[in-house]
Amino acid sequence: MAMAMEISLPFVGSSMALSAGKSRNSVSRISRVGFSSVSAVHVPRRMFMQLSGFGSVLTLLDFPSLAAPVPQMKEPEVIRTLKLPSGVRYQEIIEGEGREAHEGDLVELNYVCRRANGYFVHSTVDQFSGESSPVKLILDENDVIEGLKEVLVGMKAGGKRRALIPPSVGYINETLKPIPEEFGPRRSLLSHANEPLVFEIQLLKVL
């Protein structure tokens, strides 16, 4: 014996009551009602289950965001800060894949120098045109400031590091490199020699 279930469905302009019997399904009554009337509709159990499943499919079609899996939030990559015995702190921004620099090597690099508060001091890369004038340094404490040498040793060509260099291993005299050739930038750099300086270094080549 077929089972019938009664549900309430809204219709616009009219309502219909459908009944299911043992041998036939027929429309038993049609009546005109108001615009927002609700009628009881007798629906066979099998039809009800089919309609229910169809409705869930429509829900997913109408709202695809409900069907799509929720993407997992990625944790931001944490850049570690390493501290050397001299007090130099640095971060590995990009790990290079080229030749590794050792003490005594001649290297070519670009750099940006800033004060610890972020104010610009000097750079080998033009801020407007993007053109660069790389410098060549010998990784020796008699040629380059000690703190920068410590940061460069162990770097690989193509790598980039950001370092905070304390004045004790910075420009302890005016002959140490890197130092701008122009008078204005050189004076600006040396005027901040007694404070920590931030260097962002890109190692281009190990010669």
UniProtKB/Swiss-Prot annotation:
Subcellular localization: Plastid, Chloroplast thylakoid lumen
Keyword Thylakoid annotated: yes
Major localisation: plastid
Gene Ontology biological process: regulation of protein stability; response to high light intensity; response to water deprivation
Molecular function terms, GO-annotated: peptidyl-prolyl cis-trans isomerase activity
Pfam families, alphabetized: FKBP_C (PF00254)
Residue spans crossing the bilayer: none
Residue ranges of every copy of the PPIase FKBP-type domain listed in the record: 104-207
Highest taxon of the lineage: Eukaryota
Coiled-coil regions listed in the entry: none
EC numbers on record: 5.2.1.8
Any GO CC annotation of this UniProt entry: chloroplast
The entry's keywords: Chloroplast, Isomerase, Plastid, Rotamase, Thylakoid, Transit peptide
Catalytic activity: [protein]-peptidylproline (omega=180) = [protein]-peptidylproline (omega=0)
Family, per entry: Belongs to the FKBP-type PPIase family.
Function: PPIases accelerate the folding of proteins. It catalyzes the cis-trans isomerization of proline imidic peptide bonds in oligopeptides.
Name of the protein in question: Peptidyl-prolyl cis-trans isomerase FKBP16-1, chloroplastic
Organism: Arabidopsis thaliana (Mouse-ear cress)
